[in-house]
Design a protein with these regions (language model features):
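Small-residue-biased structural context
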Residues: 1-117
Length: 117
């Protein structure tokens, strides 16, 4: 039911998204801010979506307004992923050379590995 879906999302958030957001905010977004001027709006929007998800998880766990919250979180996460796929990743590929991309990739993997422990 709904509570199980809320619990699944909460676990997914803690097991995957916390480290994913940290990796983006500490490594990927600063690199793109420095390397590709004019994209602050997109990066700020993605960070804002991260913050919305961070703030919603405790509400999700409390069970308050669960049906609407589960729907809203699913919608927000889907929009966030689409923005990354359509705007962020192509920007990265167009402006970051393979050497720098390999270094960044290793740093992202390090942060994601830390998050899974």
């Amino acid at each position: 039911g709904l509570r199980e879906r809320a619990q699944e999302f909460s676990e997914f958030y803690r097991n995957n998204l916390v480290a994913h957001f940290r990796a983006e905010e500490e490594v990927l977004f600063p690199l793109l801010r420095d390397s590709v001027p004019g994209n602050d709006g997109m990066l700020d929007e993605l960070i804002g979506q991260h913050e919305q998800l961070r703030q919603a998880v405790p509400q999700l766990e409390s069970g308050a307004g669960l049906a609407k919250l589960v729907f809203d979180l699913g919608d927000l996460l889907e929009r966030h992923i689409r923005k990354e796929e359509r705007e962020l990743f192509p920007l990265f590929e167009a402006h970051i050379d393979s050497t720098k991309a390999a270094i960044i990739g290793a740093e992202l993997i390090r942060i994601l590995d830390e998050g899974s422990k």
